[in-house]
Amino acid sequence: MINYVYGEQLYQEFVSFRDLFLKKAVARAQHVDAASDGRPVRPVVVLPFKETDSIQAEIDKWTLMARELEQYPDLNIPKTILYPVPNILRGVRKVTTYQTEAVNSVNMTAGRIIHLIDKDIRIQKSAGINEHSAKYIENLEATKELMKQYPEDEKFRMRVHGFSETMLRVHYISSSPNYNDGKSVSYHVLLCGVFICDETLRDGIIINGEFEKAKFSLYDSIEPIICDRWPQAKIYRLADIENVKKQIAITREEKKVKSAASVTRSRKTKKGQPVNDNPESAQ
């Protein structure tokens, strides 16, 4: 029998522990982001080597408590409270912060979207129609008609834009398993933040506020659905997303084949061997 009284006590202990841990991290951080409600989030902390073991012990405690709380499903604790768990980056030579666009995603069915639109339309009409609300309702009705073209269980992804988050460019030392031939490795700073051990941080940390747009997104090739009900969101059909992913995979494989053929041709040329650019002619 599951002891939910103990589970509730453990949950309260975890929340207090987590909040204090994050508060201390924010207080000593070299950089923090601000959430939409003003809360400090994503602390980036340079950690003295001598404190690494003690912080790791606290992270391990966080992990164990979170896993134990998963054994109490009836408490309905959101996973976003338990996870993610903070991390310590080791073997880092240099790190630079930069900003990128943050996107929150949620999947919904066409039926769910229609339901939410209908609910909003009823609210707008009950409050009285003016010029602004009439245009708003017209936009919602157009989106509703579009959604009615699909089965109710057709899935869509809603991507909410409009805010930024911190990323890191991390250069690891050559003996690190994360070493990337001297090139930087991108690291997404989660809401719980990240610690960077200073043992090998000989080139330090650079706090850079520049905004960097992603070079490519598979969503760039899909026409989104725009609805005034969600002014900062773009809506995509999940089937369209999967089709683009498949096409990207095919293109990637074709490039690999061409690259391999190019290497083979180059080697044969160097050796003075004949090169057949039309293999079918040899059949």
From Swiss-Prot:
Specify the taxonomic lineage: Viruses, Duplodnaviria, Heunggongvirae, Uroviricota, Caudoviricetes
**Recorded GO terms, molecular function?**
DNA binding
The reply to whether Transcription figures as a keyword in the UniProt entry is: yes
The record's InterPro entries line, in alphabetical order, gives: Lysogenic_reg_DNA-binding, Repressor_C1
The entry's other comment says: Thermolability of the mutant P1c1.100 seems to be due to an alteration in the C-terminal half of the repressor.
From which source organism is this entry?
Escherichia phage P1 (Bacteriophage P1)
Function according to Swiss-Prot or TrEMBL: Sequence-specific DNA-binding protein required for the establishment and maintenance of lysogeny. This protein recognizes the sequence 5'-ATTTATTAGAGCA[AT]T-3'. Binding to the operator DNA of c1 repressor is sensitive to N-ethylmaleimide.
Q: Which UniProt keywords apply?
A: DNA-binding, Repressor, Transcription, Transcription regulation
Q: Which ranges of the sequence are annotated as binding DNA?
A: 30-49
Instruction: Give the protein name, as stated in the record.
Output: Repressor protein C1
Its encoding gene is what?
C1
Keyword Transmembrane included in the entry's annotation: no
Domain of life, per the record? Viruses
Q: Where is this region: Disordered?
A: 254-283
